[in-house]
């Protein structure tokens, strides 16, 4: 959806827990597309996320999309699937074994306007989960605002 939005981490981890692989863009094997509310991209099944900070619904949901906000009405259940280390976690070529080999980070790190892709997911999500650290993501802010957030959150910006 957007590398700087928390809902991206939710969908990536949800896919991995179900034994699915994640791709940055739709491809021939796409079963489900998860997109932001401004996206025109569609998959065989498309879930649209408003990207509202509190996860509110999409104000004008297209007829060919499901609204991510609908999951809030569902019970909290965890249905993790056993996953082989050799199965692909991120397309192309990143296995679940590769995911757990990402160096963990126990630091409090701030990322400003991260680019989409595996590098963002491994740094913003995987490294702090494996290392007990935390991530602050800032999007669309000025350098001054980013520096103020870094000071407030007691982090150092990561280039």
Regions found by a protein language model. Give the residues of each.
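A generic local structural motif
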Residues: 23, 97-101, 122-123
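ANL superfamily adenylate-forming
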Residues: 33-105, 150, 154-159
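Conserved AMP-binding/adenylate-forming
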Residues: 1-20, 106-126
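Short beta-strand->loop structural element characteristic of the AMP-binding/adenylate-forming
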Residues: 1, 8-12, 16-41, 46-55, ...
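C-terminal structured interaction module
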Residues: 119-139
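Anion (oxyanion) recognition and catalysis
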Residues: 16-17, 129-130, 151
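Compositionally biased, low-complexity linear motifs
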Residues: 105, 110-111, 137-156
């Amino acid at each position: 959806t957007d590398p700087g939005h928390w809902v991206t981490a939710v969908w990536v981890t949800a896919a991995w827990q179900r034994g699915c692989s994640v791709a940055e863009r739709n491809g021939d094997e796409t079963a489900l597309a998860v997109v932001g509310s401004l996206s025109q991209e569609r998959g065989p099944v498309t879930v649209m996320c408003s990207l509202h900070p509190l996860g509110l619904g999409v104000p004008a949901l297209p007829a060919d999309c499901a609204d991510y906000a609908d999951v809030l009405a569902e019970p909290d259940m965890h249905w993790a699937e056993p996953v082989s280390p050799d199965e692909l976690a991120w397309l192309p070529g990143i296995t679940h074994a590769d995911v757990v080999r990402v160096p963990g980070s126990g630091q409090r790190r701030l990322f400003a306007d991260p680019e989409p892709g595996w590098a963002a997911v491994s740094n913003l999500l995987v490294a702090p989960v494996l290392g007990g650290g935390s991530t602050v993501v800032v999007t669309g802010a000025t350098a001054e605002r980013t520096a103020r957030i870094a000071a407030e959150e007691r982090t150092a910006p990561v280039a």
